[in-house]
Every structure is written in structure tokens, then in C-alpha cells.
């Protein structure tokens, strides 16, 4: 066993390891099975283990799902929003995206929603681990499945209001997409959010013919006030 390679693998993946990775780090499948039977390791997904006993951390669970999904998989949508701190509580369901070349039947994981995309290389964050979509593309993915434009705009407000990204970055990411729901409305909405209209009330007031008194520099996001005449 290559102790260094094995240790590095576990450290990089929050102590999750796939059976297929064993030969690369000097651990044979029988050794893995023995450790699971002895209770030193535990099975998290089919062919994926946690190299410890006890309750797995959230990051270990996410890594296990990604390893089960196979090469190229990234966390996306609500789970990516969790990683980017756009939501405060993790969902019981993990959401990820795999390359479009993967057949849906090849990627069926209990408790996981799978999307497919041919643009993963462009939308994947260059540094985050576990692999995850960029915050701008996470927002756009959530907009694509939003039940209404109000819900879509709320994601934009949240991302900008929490200072996770900017209006310009969201706009550039949207320009790179061939298909986008509510594209025309979103162009306007992104501009409004960039100007400080970080709530649906403010957005509707602006487009109802009113104006907004801009909040002082440094005021909390969404602190603009309607200026009635």
C-alpha cells in the first residue's frame, strides 16, 4: 500500500474513497471489503466507502455521491447553492450534474437528483472541492427550474445581496448560454439588482412607475426605500 497516496486521497475527498480508486492508491478491493466487514470502514454508496466508523460529515456524504456518479460529476443547483452559502440549510436531496454523454441509466443514485449538461467544463468552479458549479451558473441553473419569475429573481437578489457574486458576472454567464428562461426579463432584473433593487417589492415598485431612494453606501442589502410622490 502506498501510504502517502492513500492518505492524500482520503484527505482530498473528506475520507471517502471509491473501490475503483483502490489500485491507484495501493488498496486492493479485498482489503476494502475486509475493513467494511470489521466495522473500521462503512459503505456510503455502491462501491464507495468512508474510511472511518461513525456518522459521516456532510462533505463526506457529498463526496460519496460524486464518486458514485463517476468522473466529471459536479454538485449543482440546490446543493451548489448550499456550498456557495446561498441557502442556510442543506437539502436532504443532493443535486448534481454529469456530462451529457452519460446515459441516465448509468447514473441512478438513491437520494440524488441528476442533471446532464454538455457545458460542465465551462460551468465548473476552477478550485472548489468537492467539485461544484460556479456561483453564477448555480444561480442560472436554479432560475431554469424556478416555478416562477418571482422565484428566479429571488435567487439573483440572494446571490448579489449576500455578496457571492455581482450583476455583471451573472450577466456574462447568462450571455454564454444558448437557452435561458425569461432572458429578456432577466436582463432588466439583473440590472435592477445590480443597482440595489434586492427585493421583489423594490423590483415591482420600479417597474410600476415609481422610483427608489438609494440606500447610503454601506447600508444593508435591500435597504433602498420607495420614494413616494
Label every model-predicted segment.
Residues 1-184, 200-206, 213-219:
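Short gly/ser-rich loop at a beta-strand->alpha-helix junction or flexible surface loop bordering the NTP-binding
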Residues 219-229:
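Short acidic loop-to-beta-strand element that houses the catalytic metal-binding Asp/Glu
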